[in-house]
From Swiss-Prot:
Residues 43-118 form the KH type-2 domain. PANTHER family: 30S/40S RIBOSOMAL PROTEIN S3, SMALL RIBOSOMAL SUBUNIT PROTEIN US3C. InterPro entries: KH_dom-like_a/b, KH_sf_prok-type, Ribosomal_S3_C_sf, Ribosomal_uS3_bac-typ, Ribosomal_uS3_C, Ribosomal_uS3_CS. Keywords: Chloroplast, Plastid, Ribonucleoprotein, Ribosomal protein, RNA-binding, rRNA-binding. The keyword rRNA-binding applies. HAMAP family: Ribosomal_uS3_B (MF_01309_B). The lineage of its organism: Eukaryota, Viridiplantae, Streptophyta, Embryophyta, Tracheophyta. It comes from Phalaenopsis aphrodite subsp. formosana (Moth orchid). Part of the 30S ribosomal subunit. This is Small ribosomal subunit protein uS3c. GO terms for molecular function: rRNA binding; structural constituent of ribosome. Belongs to the universal ribosomal protein uS3 family. Gene3D superfamilies: 3.30.300.20, Ribosomal protein S3, C-terminal domain.
């Protein structure tokens, strides 16, 4: 039976790069890793609390962290920055202060920058959030998957695969449903593939969403 490997970890160093970039002594590595996790969780919690109610989702593709001895640079790659910044002139400063408090760092400066992604629906995290929102609003899972694929095709990707697992449409027995459009060569290491796993809590229980997007081949 074929073993499933995470396509991002499988391609690290070839088509994928790390979202955290820093060096540490082996004994301090776990501390640095926990710091990164705290920073990311703090940012996501802040965005969740301050996002527009009407939008329903955060739109964060990923958070990049670069560390030096006395400085930490955090870059938030977001699809819809207006959801976070609009109507709030000090949005980024407030977020920076929140993270700094959580971080308890005296000797290191922290800087947060927001980078807008040109084609947000080409990012699997944003697409998974979109599908999750549709499922919460009781839209048919097939309709949600097809609409997500239509949105992705507009960004010029070469292929996409969407998978939803769990008690779909409230059925007694959990099952897996998936749909693919175009090519998704998971076995080819030089193929640049973006992937994400996302969970959504519906009235019937938790559903798992997985998305693979074939961007291009190097």
């Amino acid at each position: 039976m074929g073993q499933k490997i995470n396509p991002l970890g499988f391609r690290l160093g070839t088509t994928q790069s790390h979202h955290s970039f820093w060096f540490a002594k082996p004994k301090n590595f776990s501390i640095g890793l926990q710091e990164d996790e705290r920073i990311r969780n703090c940012i996501k919690d802040y965005v969740k609390k301050n996002k527009k109610i009407s939008s329903g989702f955060e739109g964060i593709a990923y958070i990049g962290i670069q560390k030096r001895i006395d400085f930490i640079q955090v870059i938030i790659y977001i699809g819809f920055p207006n959801l976070l910044i609009e109507g709030r002139t000090r949005g980024v400063e407030e977020l920076q202060m929140n993270v700094q408090k959580e971080f308890h760092s005296v000797n290191r400066r922290l800087n947060i920058a927001i980078t807008r992604i040109e084609k947000p629906y080409g990012q699997p995290n944003i697409l998974a959030e979109y599908i999750a929102l549709q499922l919460k609003n009781r839209v048919s899972f097939r309709k949600a998957m097809k609409k997500a694929i239509e949105l992705t095709e507009q960004t010029g990707t070469k292929g996409i695969q969407v998978q939803i697992a769990g008690r779909i449409d409230g059925k007694e027995i959990a099952r897996v449903e998936w749909i693919r459009e175009g090519r998704v060569p998971l076995q080819t290491i030089r193929a640049k593939i973006d992937h994400c796993s996302h969970t959504v809590r519906t009235i019937y229980g938790i559903l798992g969403i997985k998305i693979w997007i074939f961007v291009n081949q190097e």
